Amino acid sequence: VLFRSEGLQDAASAFISYNIAYRRDSLDAQTVARIAGIFNNNQQFKDAVDVTEVYRLSDTTNIDVNRQNAKAYCMLKEYGTAVKRYESLKELGDRSFLTLYYLGVSHYGDNWFYGAYDNLKEAYQKNPMDVNVLYYLAKASARTSWKKEGVEYMEEAFRIAVPSDSMMVRLYDGLVECYDYAGDTKKEVEALEKLYIYTKKNSILYKIACLYDWKEDEKNAIRYYRKYMATVPEDQRYALDEDGNPVEDRITLYQQAWKRIKKIKEEGFFRGDIPTKSFPVEKKDTLALRHAK
């Protein structure tokens, strides 16, 4: 890595030196690879592509140049091209950790989850403590036949991750996804509750309510629909036009939650599960009543 503790001034000096060398000889593989590495580290991915593609017009076999070229395509989310570049690197004998990792990520981005699983699994075997590898390996596994492994990998990522809020949000979001694919609704709800603690996004409460609703757990469905409704600001509860009047053909999640509570209670009443006196009306919420027909 070229950006180290020397600081930005040293990194800039290094770039100037390599740039001078590049102008003298744009076909020197070491110089091209280092300039492309600086571009990639500085998130100038298109520039990294440009300098490496010029070099590749005369030589497509240099491993260092191709690594930077492939990484730039991956970071640009041009996953199809990135996969081709990384597969070529493997054919050249490169089975380094980063090549396997980025090839797995590129396959994942290109929606070929079995290819992602194979390469990320190999990267994991080289470095089982890398949280990013575990994260993508878990997500790839969840979309293949190895759904149980997906849960295990994501749980392992939790055990070794640095507990920063941003990382925990990412991991809990991934854990929710893995439990969803594995069909473990109970664990999915638990992960969603943890995710809500970190994000405070009320849509998570609505999702939990929907999961309970789908499982026909009426008590918890109503409880979470109400939790969700309590967190929605008054000015976001209904779709209003510029004059503040309700828009008839648009229903918000708040209104949908109210409708589901009403429907669940109606169904319970007709089954004899819910007595008439427990059939509450929202507190003079005339707009909700109007749109819950």
Residue ranges and their predicted role:
Residues 7, 41-42, 75-76, 109-110, ...:
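Register position in tetratricopeptide repeats
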Residues 20-21, 54-55, 88-89, 122-123, ...:
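Canonical positions in the second alpha-helix
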